[in-house]
Amino acid sequence: MSNRALSVVVLAAGKGSRMFSTLPKVLHPLAGKAMVQHVIDTAMRLGASRIHLVYGHGGELLRERLARQYAPLNWVLQAEQRGTGHAVQQTLTCLRDEEDVLILYGDVPLISPDTLQCLLAARPQGGIGLLTVTLDNPEGYGRIVRLNGEVAGIVEQKDASEQQRQIKEINTGILVAGGEDIKRWLGQLTNKNAQGEFYLTDIIAMAWHEGRKINAVQPTRQTEVEGVNNRLQLARLERLFQREQAERLLLAGVMLSDPDRFDLRGEFRHGQDVSIDTNVILEGQVTLGDRVIIGTGCVLKNVVIGDDVIISPYTVIEDARVAARSTLGPFARLRPGSELEEDAHVGNFVEMKQARLGKGSKAGHLSYLGDAEIGAQVNIGAGTITCNYDGANKHKTHIGDDVFVGSDSQLVAPVTIGRGATIGAGTTVTRDVAEGEMIISRIRQFPLANWTRPVKKK
């Protein structure tokens, strides 16, 4: 394996017309992340010193989505799409003689660092490392031509003879070569072929005619080199990828009720004896402690969940923290900035945002708690609302320990309710409540004399 610096070229200029979308093909998501982001992340994990992104169709949108997250990218425009060789030619002024150059594709998202490390290690001095795969049905792919067992060239499907079309080893397009060599070969490319395009694959024959060795390497899994040209292929690749992730988690001790009905769209850390029911989606950065139970249909995004937490079905949690032994749902929602301390409970149809629920506190039913600091051992009655927005600004509600808030109460912020206070059902709180105080603001109940119920007109 070479000790030289590694430069990675990512080809991402294709329009993707078969996606039938205004979104550039490489920006379509797989497992919650744009396909091209998977490729860039892999290149970064390889320790690439420079990454050149060749873009074309939808370039402004591509730069808008990626430039901030991937500041070191070198953006290279391919104004006219004339083949893979032409795409890499656009980087000629960027490539250095003393580095190795690895070619990747923005629509081949699942290529792994392990496979690429093997490819880099296999590149012979002065030659090419080429990633190939053997398919039962190689229709549509460029075939690997061998002479005396050695790779001698690649012939594209449309240029292949009937005999060559019987070859089952195909080109993935992924290769690595020295900068000085690949620059020379790129300068020799022509478009004298059935497509009238500049094929990157032609450099294989050039290397062979120079007496250079081409070492072929195959990926660990075939899914690593599957490309995406339409939504059907993307959906199939998504399910294959999710199945692989589910199997990995099962082998690591996570209980998945059905591995075919689980989606992981980010990074997942977990403790022991975690149990996840069907149709659960984990997004972003998710951390689950020991013995966490997640019911069917839940969505967790960028969350930290403590030990022994039970999350009942159809609960949605985003950018929040839940401490040990808390319970949520069913149908609860924690929006960004929410936090539950130990042994807290958020029940059905309770929504929290920028709010903290203290140790042992409970909000069991049908409540909205926004911009609120709630102490320990507080009971929030059904239908309670913290009225945090005055039409222009948000305001805080502070609730001390051991407070009891009766059902159907409105707490108009900014307001503070002291420790041990009791709020009667149906009360609208507009002023601070002292410690231990009992308040009630609903009108006195009285009967209406001589009242009769209306009767429907016939």
Swiss-Prot record:
Segments of this protein annotated with the region Linker: 232-252
Keywords for the protein's UniProt record, in alphabetical order: Acyltransferase, Cell shape, Cell wall biogenesis/degradation, Cytoplasm, Magnesium, Metal-binding, Multifunctional enzyme, Nucleotidyltransferase, Peptidoglycan synthesis, Repeat, Transferase
Annotated residues for binding of acetyl-CoA: A382, N388, Y389, S407, A425, R442
Self-association and partners: Homotrimer.
HAMAP family given in the database record: GlmU
Summary of the function given for this chain in its UniProt record: Catalyzes the last two sequential reactions in the de novo biosynthetic pathway for UDP-N-acetylglucosamine (UDP-GlcNAc). The C-terminal domain catalyzes the transfer of acetyl group from acetyl coenzyme A to glucosamine-1-phosphate (GlcN-1-P) to produce N-acetylglucosamine-1-phosphate (GlcNAc-1-P), which is converted into UDP-GlcNAc by the transfer of uridine 5-monophosphate (from uridine 5-triphosphate), a reaction catalyzed by the N-terminal domain.
Name of this chain's protein: Bifunctional protein GlmU
Species in which this protein is naturally found: Sodalis glossinidius (strain morsitans)
